[in-house]
């Protein structure tokens, strides 16, 4: 609809009115209390046409929430929402050879950074099948997401597998995806958030517009309690023994002999990283941004694990692989 850009400006924390056609943007939604509700990448397909992605399994809830606002709060806006979740199948080509594989599949598509930069999309034909390709990444690697009509999903998948054989292509699952995104410090809403986290708590204040007049949850971000310096904040954790993988949900303490023991936070995501050859974890810790380098403890079933508070980005901090 003609007010689609204005609608996105109101539901996301960042700005959308100047997003160019053919470009993608990561967006963060808040509840009215200022806490993170959902995130995803939205692409501008045309002047008045966008396609929005949400967290895994969150599409129906987000659609319901947006419809509620559209019908009860902003009925004057010329906007129409349609669920296309079941209409498309998506194959994600991910890794340093993904550009070479895509070039084999669509040899006449210019994949140069000038023509097809990160966070942009193209409409193409693959074996006469109309597809959308987004150059976006949740793994931190060079990635292309191919969206095809659902009935052609398997055909596109097989096309990717066949084209990638010479590069030793292999399917990867959600566990691998979760590990790779954790190495980059990318959050999963509902895992690294719990309904009490603001963008600032997640070290994502960069995504909150300072210029927009309003958006859902903006006023609540400036409440005294929400602006406290010692709120629980997202941090990285590194174990003293790099082979120990922390339990997700485990509590974090500063003193082992304190009675009663004060719980500073908990582990939200934890994995062993083959890329780094050590365990990594994300956690929310009270006053976390001022705890960098501090030694803390994570009590587990058989022993107390010593950890050090670290940056949330463990790998490729300069995004060299993402922009390869």
Segments from the language model and where they lie:
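Well-ordered mid-protein domain cores that form the structural environment of catalytic cofactors
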Residues: 10, 14-69
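Internal amphipathic helical hairpin motif
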Residues: 2-36, 98-129
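Conserved, structured C-terminal
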Residues: 45-324
């Amino acid at each position: 609809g003609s007010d689609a850009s204005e609608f996105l400006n109101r539901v996301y924390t960042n700005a959308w009115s100047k997003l160019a056609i053919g470009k993608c943007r990561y967006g963060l939604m808040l509840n009215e209390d200022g806490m993170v509700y959902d995130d995803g990448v939205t692409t501008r397909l045309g002047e008045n046409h966008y396609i929005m992605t949400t967290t895994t399994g969150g599409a129906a809830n987000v659609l319901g929430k947006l419809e509620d606002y559209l019908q009860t709060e902003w009925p004057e806006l010329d906007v129409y929402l349609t669920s296309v979740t079941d209409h498309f199948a998506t194959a994600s080509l991910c890794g340093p050879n993904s550009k070479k594989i895509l070039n084999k599949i669509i040899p006449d598509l210019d994949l140069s950074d000038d023509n097809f930069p990160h966070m942009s999309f193209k409409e193409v034909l693959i074996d006469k099948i109309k597809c959308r390709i987004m150059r976006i990444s949740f793994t931190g690697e060079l990635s292309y997401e191919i969206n095809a009509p659902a009935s052609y999903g398997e055909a596109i998948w097989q096309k990717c597998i066949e084209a990638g054989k010479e590069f030793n292509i292999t399917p990867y699952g959600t566990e691998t995806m979760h590990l790779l995104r954790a190495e980059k410090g990318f959050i999963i809403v509902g895992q690294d958030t719990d309904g009490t986290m603001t963008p600032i708590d997640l070290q994502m204040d960069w995504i909150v517009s300072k210029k927009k007049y309003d958006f859902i949850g903006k006023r609540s971000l400036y409440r005294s309690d929400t602006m406290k310096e010692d709120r629980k904040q997202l941090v990285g954790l590194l174990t003293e023994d790099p082979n120990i993988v922390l339990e997700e949900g485990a509590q974090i303490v500063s003193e082992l002999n304190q009675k009663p023991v004060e719980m500073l936070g908990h582990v939200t995501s934890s994995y062993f990283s083959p890329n780094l050859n050590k365990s990594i974890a994300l956690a929310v810790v009270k006053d976390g941004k001022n705890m960098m380098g501090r030694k803390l403890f994570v009590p587990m079933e058989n022993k107390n694990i010593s950890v050090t508070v670290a940056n949330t980005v463990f790998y490729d901090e300069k995004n060299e692989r993402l922009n390869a």
